[in-house]
């Protein structure tokens, strides 16, 4: 992912996305640079409109980000329901224990 981030950073700052610049960004970040991966990235991005790809990804990520809090809230509600059920079972078991002394 750091290779893609390097390319995105270069694009955002208006720098040319080439092997030398990608290597420089990665080295500045302290990452180990694999020349083959850098070359593959540059080749893969050759016909890609990065601006369009970033906008498309940002739009697709927005609904997913909005769904995350709802899913967390739902999981919390389920946990509360399970706790209530366990408490009810414990109370019922305690009541039965009193019957048999």
UniProtKB/Swiss-Prot annotation:
According to its UniProt entry, the protein's GO biological process terms are: translational elongation
Gene Ontology molecular function, alphabetical = structural constituent of ribosome
Q: Where is this region: Disordered?
A: 61-101
UniProt KW keywords? Ribonucleoprotein, Ribosomal protein
Cellular component GO terms, alphabetically? ribonucleoprotein complex; ribosome
**Bias-annotated ranges (Acidic residues):** 73-92
Q: Where is the composition biased (Low complexity)?
A: 61-72
How does it associate, per the subunit comment? Part of the 50S ribosomal subunit. Homodimer, it forms part of the ribosomal stalk which helps the ribosome interact with GTP-bound translation factors. Forms a heptameric uL10/P0(P1)2(P1)2(P1)2 complex, where uL10/P0 forms an elongated spine to which the P1 dimers bind in a sequential fashion.
Which HAMAP family does the UniProt record give? Ribosomal_L12_arch (MF_01478)
- Tell me the protein family, please: Belongs to the eukaryotic ribosomal protein P1/P2 family.
Biological role stated in the UniProt entry: Forms part of the ribosomal stalk, playing a central role in the interaction of the ribosome with GTP-bound translation factors.
Q: What is this protein called?
A: Large ribosomal subunit protein P1
Q: Which organism is it from?
A: Methanothermobacter thermautotrophicus (strain ATCC 29096 / DSM 1053 / JCM 10044 / NBRC 100330 / Delta H) (Methanobacterium thermoautotrophicum)
